[in-house]
A protein has these predicted regions:
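Hydrophobic residues at beta-strand termini and immediately following loops
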Residues: 6, 30, 92-93, 109
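Flexible, charged surface loops at secondary-structure boundaries
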Residues: 13, 21-24, 44-48, 120, ...
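Residue-level detector of beta-strand structural context in well-folded domains
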Residues: 17-19, 96, 117
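Metallo-beta-lactamase
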Residues: 27-29, 35-36, 72, 82, ...
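Short, conserved beta-strand segments within well-ordered enzyme catalytic domains
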Residues: 20, 29, 53
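Short, hydrophobic/aromatic-rich segments at coil-to-beta transitions
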Residues: 2-6, 101-107
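Zn-dependent metallo-beta-lactamase
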Residues: 1-25, 204
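Active-site HxH/HxHxD metal-binding segment of metal-dependent hydrolases
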Residues: 15, 34-102, 188, 192-199
Length: 204
């Protein structure tokens, strides 16, 4: 489905992973990698960048450089806008999902930060930023309790809402900024989401 891991992590984004979605209606760069010539040339060869989607305020890195190079529209929830991102072109508000396109849905998931969102692509790939990842130690999906900057109870409520998307959209991939990626059948993903919520409740 033309989903790629970018590499070229940036210290400005605390080493977070970023991803690239190649699609006929415009490519999407998910969170900002380091702006470096080999990557930029590769992105150009693959059709450039239409949207630079930023999951939250921590992982914006070289967003301005990518915007200037590709003329892409940047996307960041208004609750996570800072002095460094005031010029972002698209600033979703509120807590309702936003249909960016027929195959792209932005889902607000406050908790890690006040304006954290996740991106669902084709109902199959969920780009989760710092909201949700696979833990090899726990052998399950989890959230980052020690790196929750807004509200842990709020993040739990967000995760419960996200679990409903597992039932509705049956996504199969969790692609985080930190932590391990995870893939499973939709039924197992639903079980994992509920197990994650139980764990989050246990470490309040």
């Amino acid at each position: 489905d033309n989903v790629y891991y970018c590499g070229y992590h940036s210290k400005k984004s605390f080493g977070a992973a970023s991803y690239f979605i190649q699609r006929p209606d415009g490519n999407v760069l998910v969170d900002s990698p380091r702006f470096t010539p080999p990557l930029v040339k590769r992105l150009e060869a693959m059709g450039g960048v239409r949207y630079l989607y930023l999951t939250h305020r921590d992982d914006v890195a070289d967003h301005e450089k990518f915007h200037k190079r590709f003329g892409c529209d940047r996307i960041l929830h208004t609750q996570d806008i800072t002095a460094n991102t005031q010029s972002v072109e698209i600033q979703p508000t509120g807590t309702e999902p936003l249909e960016l396109a027929a195959d792209l849905r932005i889902i607000p998931q406050p908790g890690h930060s006040a304006g954290h969102t996740v991106l669902l692509y084709r109902g199959k790939y969920l780009f989760t930023g710092d909201h949700l990842a696979w833990s090899a130690r726990l052998n399950q999906l989890y959230a980052f309790r020690n790196f929750c900057w807004d509200s842990w109870p709020r993040q739990i409520e967000s995760m419960k809402a996200l679990a409903h998307y597992t039932d509705s959209y049956r996504f199969e991939w969790v692609l985080p900024g930190h932590g391990r990626r995870f893939q499973s059948a939709p039924e197992a993903m639903g079980q994992q989401m509920h197990q994650c919520i139980q764990w989050m409740d246990s470490v309040r």
